[in-house]
Amino acid sequence: MRNWRIPMANVIVIGAGAAGMMAAYAASLCGHQVLILEKNEKAGKKIYITGKGRCNLTNASDLETIFASIVHNGKFMYSSLYTFDNQAVMDFFITNGLEIKTERGNRVFPQSDHSSDVIRTLVQVLKKQGVETRLHAEVTDLVQKDGKITG
């Protein structure tokens, strides 16, 4: 096990998957100094295989159609989708230089059909925001003191 010297950060995100990278981005927009710790050798590793390697970004249907298509109680998704909806996802990628397309079933993919372009866009946005990412940095334990994570 390797002990990393971790710089001070207001926010530390564990994992550089899609959710981790977007959480880091959101925190950076709030002015936080953000550090991502990723155990793998590259960010977004699992994104490479989504959508058969093409990365299905979202669905372009209206939110009510999306909720209705969820077999079991779509209400659990209300708060997250009303906060950052599918249109916001598309706008985020377009604004950051990723061309997208909508296919059958309103599925949204990168125009290139390469998930690597999605990852590249996310990584570039994080760098632009000053987010630091440490690869090969597996988190195995959290140290708490007075109800706060201190290490």
Task: List each language-model region with its residue ranges.
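A conserved short coil-to-beta-strand element within the FAD-binding core of flavoproteins
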Residues: 135-148
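Short, Lys/Arg-enriched N-terminal segments with co-localized hydrophobic residues
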Residues: 1-7
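Short glycine-/acidic-enriched loop or helix-start segments at secondary-structure transitions
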Residues: 23-24, 46, 144
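N-terminal Rossmann-like FAD-binding beta1-loop-alpha1 element of flavoenzymes
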Residues: 9-36
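Generic recognition of long tandem-repeat/solenoid scaffolds
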Residues: 108-109, 149-151
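Conserved N-terminal/central alpha/beta ligand/cofactor-binding core
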Residues: 39-132, 137
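Short hydrophobic core segments
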Residues: 12-14, 37, 139-140, 151
